Amino acid sequence: MISTSDFRTGLTVEIDNDVYQIIEFQHVKPGKGAAFVRTKMRNMRTGAVIERTFNPNEKLAPARIERQEVQYLYNDGESYNMMNMETYDQFTVSKADMGDAIKWLKENMTLTIASFNGNIIAVDLPNTVELAVVETAPGIKGDTASGGGKPATLETGAVINVPFFVNIGDVLQVDTRTGNYVKRV
């Protein structure tokens, strides 16, 4: 059991058969009355953020999250086929379970899947991926004077904003957490 005094940002706890990750927490000691811990937590399944207050003597169960390193093999239209890097077992992951990770998936990419009670709750991608530009407007001389950028479609179908000097065929490094252009590779 985890005491509220042991709360840390990023800690995962189980509340009502759901997994929550602590985003923020604050120990509050009012001048009058008992102390308490105010938290902001994200539901790992739904992504919803809730605020909850706990008594200082309250104890919570730690969430037993299993993480496995997998390799993305291919998409068969309805689901995404993965291979466990330790056991080499192949399995499928539904489009809903993949979430926003679909935008950055490239065949043979290594990623981490987190599961709770056998259900996938999170797909963790590398912080950056390298993807080729398949469609963008050509850069015109003098465009850079105004700054800004232009939209570009990547090989996975994701559309991001890139600087004017980027052309079709360029390989870019993209931050998967924010969806921002990092640099040309």
Swiss-Prot record:
Any one GO CC term of the record: cytoplasm
UniProt-listed GO biological process terms: peptide biosynthetic process
Pathways per UniProt: Protein biosynthesis; polypeptide chain elongation
Keyword Signal recorded: no
Cell compartments where the protein resides: Cytoplasm
Keyword Cytoplasm: yes
Superkingdom, taxonomy of origin: Bacteria
Record GO terms (molecular function): translation elongation factor activity
SMART domains membership: EFP, Elong-fact-P_C
Keywords of this entry: Cytoplasm, Elongation factor, Protein biosynthesis
Pfam families: EFP, EFP_N, Elong-fact-P_C
Sequence similarity: Belongs to the elongation factor P family.
Role, per record: Involved in peptide bond synthesis. Stimulates efficient translation and peptide-bond synthesis on native or reconstituted 70S ribosomes in vitro. Probably functions indirectly by altering the affinity of the ribosome for aminoacyl-tRNA, thus increasing their reactivity as acceptors for peptidyl transferase.
PANTHER family, A to Z: ELONGATION FACTOR P, ELONGATION FACTOR P (EF-P) FAMILY PROTEIN
Alphabetized NCBIfam families for the sequence: efp, PRK00529.1
Name under which the protein is recorded: Elongation factor P
Species the sequence originates in: Desulforamulus reducens (strain ATCC BAA-1160 / DSM 100696 / MI-1) (Desulfotomaculum reducens)
